[in-house]
Amino acid sequence: MKKALLALNSIKKSGVIDDYAIGGAIAASFYIEAINTEDVDVFLFMSASENSILLSLRPIYDALEQLGGRVEKEYIVIGDWPIQILPAYSPLVEEAIIQAVTVQYGNIETRIFTAEHLCAIALDTGRMKDFYRVASFIEQGKVDRLVLNQLVIRYKLEDRTKNVLNWSSDEN
């Protein structure tokens, strides 16, 4: 993972991307017991190119290939780690990128989503493994329930908390 983080920091420093934040299982592993995963989910802001309304990952992939990455399916593999580049696809993810926290991975600085944003995005995604992850955060006391509750209400995720976690967003 070290090579992947160094490459991401390099393309940030060179201006290919403005910033990034890691989400998914890798980010969750900074808070709760390690979770098996095969890739690194990297979220960032993107805008369409001048001549197109479509978003293109090509400039990012080109820059990462110059740093030793190779494209495989929807990933760019750096070292042994498949990196999935994901545009900020919702206001919740945009907020998660903006409010991401800086952490150390060994001697490398990187940014990850807050525990509360990871949980809110997991609730929004709605897969069983995501609900399990939210329950793990809560059971291990790694999430501020008040902050999570505010996200749940702001992004209208109350039905997810009631149906899956037996937790009403009215609870603090």
Residue ranges with predicted function:
Residues 1-172:
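Compositionally biased terminal segments of proteins
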